[in-house]
């Protein structure tokens, strides 16, 4: 299953969330819904080099995808 970290106020997240709606291969995790979700995302963002460029330019790094093999991608 592909995990997708999103937030409703992010326009890019809204777009991709609609694209995967109803697809059982995706688990959509809203980081604004519960502090546990936010903590999972922060841990990922703080420890994964996939976020280095996003952090350099001041982006949050969502939407973010964690593929089945553990690969993290922002695209």
What are these regions (language model features)?
Residues 1-31:
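Local sequence-structure signature of Cys/Sec-based thiol-disulfide redox active-site neighborhoods
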Residues 25-47:
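Thiol-based oxidoreductase modules, predominantly thioredoxin-like and allied folds used
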Residues 50-51:
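Major-groove DNA-recognition helix of helix-turn-helix-type DNA-binding domains
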Residues 54-61:
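Thiol/disulfide oxidoreductase modules built on the thioredoxin-like
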Residues 61-72:
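A short, hydrophobic beta-strand/beta-hairpin element that forms part of a small beta-sheet core
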Residues 75:
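Catalytic Cys-His active-site segments of thiol-dependent hydrolases/isopeptidases
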